[in-house]
Amino acid sequence: MIGGFLGAGKTTSVAALAEHLSAAGRTVGLITNDQGRELVDTAMLRSKGFATEEIPGGCFCCRFNSLVDAAGKLTESTRPDVFIAEPVGSCTDLVATVTYPLRRIYGDEFSIAPLSVLVDPVRAARVFGLSEGGQFSEKVIYIYRKQLEEADLIVINKTDLLEPDALTTLQAKLAEEFPNAEVLQISARTGEGLDAWFNRITDAEQIARNVMEVD
């Protein structure tokens, strides 16, 4: 799964990963998710030729059966050897509600890649007090931090938006705040850092984590 808050660049990154895997000879199936009934992301990914199923009207974390059904449809139509799932931008607690059930029920059929959570560097710098700007509500910050708390890989996207020194400071701050995660830098737009991220996703199965507490 590739998660992250709204505006982190998830769909662009999913497309880049799918293109990378396809070029390497892998068959890819994509699953998109949103709270609305019309998923623009689905149309964009399908326009690039990727087999894509969508789960509208609710998050993976409360529609696990729909996620499994979508994977089943892709298996019947395309027989992908890699699934990439993009949860809704406000979704959290994915390890407890998606990863653990998948591993328990379908452990013989699926290998679970590390959970990547993308961040917009400008927003992250504001959330963690590294730059000035409009403040977010406590509820937004709570969800934002919880998403990062369960990540195996925290992926700073849109690296072209900050100066190198600011990116280094942000990366160090995220590593300090979330020591269980590996922090990477990429730009899905320019391609910078994508190979290193893709290698981390495909080379390691998701590590076992304690289920986090969500209020």
What residues fall within each predicted segment?
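Nucleotide-state-sensitive switch-loop elements of NTP-binding domains
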Residues: 1-3, 8, 12-142
